């Protein structure tokens, strides 16, 4: 048995009908668009309140199970629903796509047809057609003479065919709503693309070191980490007279293939950007100290953060003075200004030492260090904390916001139309606008007045009908 093959158009025809008559009207429903918008706004608020892209330990500490925040919000619920990365969850992206589809459907079914209607026009050829306009009048013994020029002076585009005239201005206002929809679609597309292809990372790099981007805190499914490296040429901090940190700086180089391709000094609010990746100055730390004991070669000792009750920053390092590590010094550093506080293994304060200076321990603490022992503090090595971010959707978002402002401004232009018909007895004049009715009423009244004063009268052959100028019934007499 052979099954006859059907043409492709026979298969596609039901799909087209379903798309045009069922799916498209559903997506274009204003209630659906408002509901999606409110859902996106609510989830965005949740993503603003709940810290994003933090560690599990952070959520366990801030959202414990007992007692639960608001009686139900725990770290398990946050991680299960993906509220720790709201903007990258599949359901949030699905809402954005659905909202974008609703906007596109609205543009296709409502805004685009309205623009097509606005671009089409026709002359009014019968006097009674003017009576259906919001503003109209009859000027007996008047003609079209001078009217086209006056309309052009007011910014109208004028079309004339003998005794018939049509003029319009503000057509750009009809493009405004469409441009607003297009801009919103670009913003949504940029947000979706940024969630899928963007990433966030952190790096704590000591001064003088080179590091790659490895500590990723969040990345989309389509994200690609760059292969170039970051070199910290120098890191330093500016302090206020009272000891507060004013600003911290990092002299960075981008190494691509071992070659320096960009160098820039960054600080807070002054990042470095390279190939769509932005490096922000976010934090700082002390990585290590370089010291010498007596005449030994310089050696480097790492430092570790020391917790304090006040929550202030403090770092410590242990410097052994014996090969078996039974004796030594504890150095505490509160900042990068180069001052270290020295304590022995019993916790007794010995003295202080500044970067680039030496301290004879056998002189300041002869009981603890009877033999000659001089400590040289050559350098306190700082580390810069970088926040690294790549969001390829940002150009689309910026373009969308620019077009949005332009579209909103365009929407404020009134779309005004004027018709005129010259007969043997006189002139019929009418018009309408979609906004600024009072302004158009005044403009139309001035236009009628100027036409009455400038147009030469001719013998009337029929009585004037009732006319409406500015929305009021009157009898237009020359």
UniProtKB/Swiss-Prot annotation:
Secreted found in the keyword field: no
InterPro entries: Cyt_c_bgen_Ccs1/CcsB/ResB, ResB-like_domain
Compartments reported by the entry: Cellular thylakoid membrane
Positions with biased composition (Pro residues): 456-466
Transmembrane segments: 30-50, 89-109, 175-195
Any one GO BP annotation for this protein: cytochrome complex assembly
Pfam families the record matches: ResB
Chief subcellular location: membrane
Keyword terms of this UniProt record: Cytochrome c-type biogenesis, Membrane, Thylakoid, Transmembrane, Transmembrane helix
GO CC, alphabetical: plasma membrane-derived thylakoid membrane
Function according to Swiss-Prot or TrEMBL: Required during biogenesis of c-type cytochromes (cytochrome c6 and cytochrome f) at the step of heme attachment.
HAMAP family to which the protein is assigned, alphabetical: CytC_Ccs1
Complex formation: May interact with CcsA.
Family designation: Belongs to the Ccs1/CcsB family.
Name of this chain's protein: Cytochrome c biogenesis protein CcsB
């Amino acid at each position: 048995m052979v099954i006859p093959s059907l043409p492709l158009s026979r298969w596609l025809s039901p799909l087209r009908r379903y798309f045009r008559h069922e799916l498209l009207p559903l997506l274009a429903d204003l209630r659906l668009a408002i509901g999606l918008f409110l859902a996106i706004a609510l989830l965005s608020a949740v993503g603003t309140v709940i810290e994003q892209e933090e560690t599990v330990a952070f959520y366990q500490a801030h959202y414990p199970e007992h007692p639960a925040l608001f009686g139900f919000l725990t770290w398990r619920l946050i991680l299960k629903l993906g509220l720790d990365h709201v903007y990258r969850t599949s359901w949030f992206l699905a809402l954005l796509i659905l909202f974008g589809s609703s906007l596109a459907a609205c543009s296709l079914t409502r805004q685009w047809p309205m623009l097509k209607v606005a671009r089409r026009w026709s002359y009014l050829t019968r006097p009674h057609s003017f009576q259906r306009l919001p503003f109209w009048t009859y000027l007996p013994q008047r003609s079209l003479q001078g009217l086209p020029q006056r309309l052009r002076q007011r910014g109208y585009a004028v079309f004339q065919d003998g005794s018939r005239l049509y003029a319009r201005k503000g057509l750009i206002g009809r493009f405004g709503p469409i441009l607003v929809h297009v801009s919103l679609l670009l913003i949504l597309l940029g947000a979706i693309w940024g969630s899928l292809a963007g990433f966030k990372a952190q790096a704590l790099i000591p001064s003088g070191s080179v590091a790659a981007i490895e500590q990723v805190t969040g990345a989309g499914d389509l994200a690609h980490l760059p292969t170039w490296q970051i070199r910290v040429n120098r890191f330093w901090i500016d302090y206020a007279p009272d000891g507060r940190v004013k600003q911290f700086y990092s002299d960075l180089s981008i190494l691509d293939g071992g070659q320096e391709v960009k160098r820039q000094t960054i600080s807070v609010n002054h990042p470095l950007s390279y190939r769509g990746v932005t490096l922000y100055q976010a934090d700082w730390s002390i990585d290590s100290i370089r010291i010498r004991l007596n005449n030994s070669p310089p050696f480097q000792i790492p430092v570790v953060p020391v917790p304090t009750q006040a929550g202030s920053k403090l770092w410590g390092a242990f410097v052994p003075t014996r090969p078996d590590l039974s004796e030594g010094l504890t150095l505490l550093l509160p900042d990068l200004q180069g001052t270290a506080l020295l304590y022995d293994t019993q916790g007794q304060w010995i003295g202080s030492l500044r970067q680039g200076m030496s301290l004879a321990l056998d002189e300041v603490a002869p009981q603890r260090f009877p033999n000659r022992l001089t400590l040289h503090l050559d350098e306190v090595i700082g580390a810069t904390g970088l926040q690294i971010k790549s969001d390829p959707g940002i150009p689309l978002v910026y373009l969308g916001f620019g077009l949005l402002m332009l579209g909103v401004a365009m929407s404020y232009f009134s779309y005004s139309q004027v018709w005129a018909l010259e007969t043997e007895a006189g002139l019929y004049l009418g018009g309408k606008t979609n906004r600024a009715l009072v302004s158009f009423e005044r403009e139309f009244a001035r236009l009628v007045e100027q036409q009455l004063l400038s147009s030469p009268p001719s013998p009337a052959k029929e009585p004037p009908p009732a006319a409406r100028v500015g929305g009021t019934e009157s009898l237009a007499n020359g």
